[in-house]
């Protein structure tokens, strides 16, 4: 009886993920935090083939910020993480980068794969994946509660360079009640493939963040009395590398607008 209930829950979650992707394919644009709870979400970056090795090495050298979940070969658009999905259309919002600068945001990236048929795509673990376990433990995830995007910040922590790529770590922030910080660290730490435990707790100035009310990406969130800002490595870090390194061309997800997979978050729980 219990097994059948769990299977029904799993099927419902997969169906929710597929429905979300279909909605994005049809043109819906929204941040994905809280969508299809229990399913793994992923950051995305696609680069021309001659930059792929640099990025793979960059990710290998910086696994906290860039944990690779899948690599889609040059010219392909499908991933083993989501049956029938198309990486060009099934993310709600994409960013297009030219010579290290943000050129535009689009809801359908299909023409970009026509323009650059040799794109190699990397799917990177996302901390949205462990937000459901945080909520199940009674820890409010503020940006979900308030219906906003997660705040993200560039930091003074430099990633280890690789080939032509270099840049700083980007972090996401969630305010956590002081008495629950240890729980948040423990819960997220069981998900190392999606950034794992925090990289910093407390004073944002230690990361070079001057003002929490002015995130570099996403939306500012309220911090209540008795709460402490907790910072996790973020999969927007590759976008910082694109900017710092002047990559000629790249396509990424827009911050907070993830690729929702068919993989349960429990798959990455250790």
Curated annotation (Swiss-Prot):
Enzyme Commission number(s) of this protein: 4.2.1.-
GO molecular function annotation: lyase activity
Pfam families: D-Glu_cyclase
Top-level taxon of origin: Bacteria
Keywords assigned: Lyase
PANTHER family (alphabetical): D-GLUTAMATE CYCLASE, MITOCHONDRIAL
Family, similarity comment: Belongs to the D-glutamate cyclase family.
Record protein name field: Putative hydro-lyase H16_B1759
Originating organism: Cupriavidus necator (strain ATCC 17699 / DSM 428 / KCTC 22496 / NCIMB 10442 / H16 / Stanier 337)
């Amino acid at each position: 009886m219990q097994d059948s209930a769990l299977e029904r829950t799993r099927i419902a979650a997969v169906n929710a993920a597929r429905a979300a992707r279909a909605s994005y394919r049809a043109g819906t644009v929204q941040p994905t935090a809280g969508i299809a709870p229990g399913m793994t979400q992923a950051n995305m970056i696609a680069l021309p083939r001659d930059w792929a090795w640099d990025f793979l090495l960059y990710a290998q050298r910086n696994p906290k910020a860039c944990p690779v979940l899948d690599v889609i070969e040059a010219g392909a658009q499908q991933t083993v993480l989501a049956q029938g999905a198309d990486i060009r259309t099934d993310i709600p919002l994409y960013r297009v980068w030219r010579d290290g600068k943000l050129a535009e945001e689009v809801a359908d990236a299909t023409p970009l794969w026509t323009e650059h048929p040799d794109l190699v795509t990397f799917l990177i673990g996302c901390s949205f994946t462990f937000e459901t376990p945080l909520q199940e433990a009674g820890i409010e995830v503020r940006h979900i509660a308030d219906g906003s995007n997660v705040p993200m910040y560039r930091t003074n922590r430099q990633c280890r360079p690789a080939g032509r790529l270099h840049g700083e770590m980007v972090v996401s922030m969630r305010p956590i009640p002081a008495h629950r910080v240890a729980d948040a660290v423990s819960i997220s730490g069981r998900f190392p493939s999606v950034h794992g435990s925090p990289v910093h707790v407390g004073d944002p100035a230690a990361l070079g963040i001057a003002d929490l009310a002015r995130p570099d990406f996403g939306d500012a969130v309220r911090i209540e009395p008795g709460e402490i800002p907790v910072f996790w490595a973020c999969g927007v870090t590759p976008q910082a590398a694109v900017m710092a390194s002047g990559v000629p061309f790249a396509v990424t997800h827009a911050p907070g607008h993830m690729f929702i997979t068919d993989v349960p978050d429990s798959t990455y729980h250790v």
